[in-house]
Amino acid sequence: MALVSRVNSPLRSRLATERYRRQHDELSALSASMEQKLEGVQAGESATDLRRLLAQYSGKLSVHLRMEDEALYPRALGGGDASLQRVAAALQRDVGPLHEEFQRFLEAWPSAATIESRPRDFAMQLARILRTIARRMQREEAELYPLVDALE
């Protein structure tokens, strides 16, 4: 299940949100890779590669959230556009609980062995958290990024 897909356009490289969109693409690609590996783990294969991908995903997500927190959201909230401020405030409010949920997920699955011991539980929880994050990225791209790009 592809969680976020998008066609690259020449305009994207000129947008203020280009690097955030690229990070979304990278996170989506890692999601797809994890989903592929998950099939093998559910069939009894080692979860080592899957746990490594999850660690990569976690690292990229942390960098992405930090960049948004330090640059994107302050810019959006500090701009003069009331619509942009409203959208940014709503999205920023939601990110804390989402990040906490993801951290709890990581703590519950600290190793390949824990994944291998309960692959079905892991699969259900992974699918749920990835869907939640994908929906969040889609909202940013549909609601926030066009408003930020319009400031340019």
Task: Locate predicted features.
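Small-residue-biased structural context
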Residues: 1-152
